[in-house]
């Protein structure tokens, strides 16, 4: 196969990056309300959602060397296949245990998906041209993510507004569409992502797993020695708590105000879309302000 140019690598990277976030945009307006529709209480929704965070926390560092050991393509294909399985299960889940499994699978997906696409882009860019500037592509990915999530959320709101499709509830339709788009994204990934070099083998994976506890210890040590780092981590921690609370309670409160969960989800679609478009604009403007 002909070697990719820098421009081709960037185009493929941004295409895959957008496809990675599009299903997320579709599910954002309906996640909480769909679980409520299936019988979960707010406290149960909070508990099942923790599965994702716990799995990511447990796997993030140990799986960090998988891309080096097996190759970015293998890891990303596995991650996106797990995401597809999670979305398919989300569409039919009707119990606490099944929703817990859905979120645990999402945790596996996010742990595996964290990093390989970016590293592939950097390595492929440098393989095409050792002097190429890859930072603009990485920076533009934030804009692409914002735009695709906004598009997915807007599409989700439109699908919900159209109402149920046969026996499928209006809140379930966006999840099914998200699963279909995830399947398309998986096929596109197989076509577009071409490895630039051989995988490093099992030794790289063993080294990553062995180094994980030491890296955690070093990170904790840095936090203890640096008040600036501790403050930054604290900001992220409290911001995360606030966002999770906001994203969990807003749909429920809106459903109470308008008197209909489906109408609330339909309104959340364009509202989320506008928010993510602003995020995309901010990501695009950031390089100009630095």
Segments from the language model and where they lie:
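Helix-to-loop junctions at the C-terminal end of transmembrane segments
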Residues: 58-71, 160, 281-290
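Helix-loop boundary and gating motifs at the non-cytosolic
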Residues: 2-58, 91, 227-276
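Hydrophobic core of transmembrane alpha-helices in multi-pass small-molecule transporters
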Residues: 18, 86, 96-113, 237
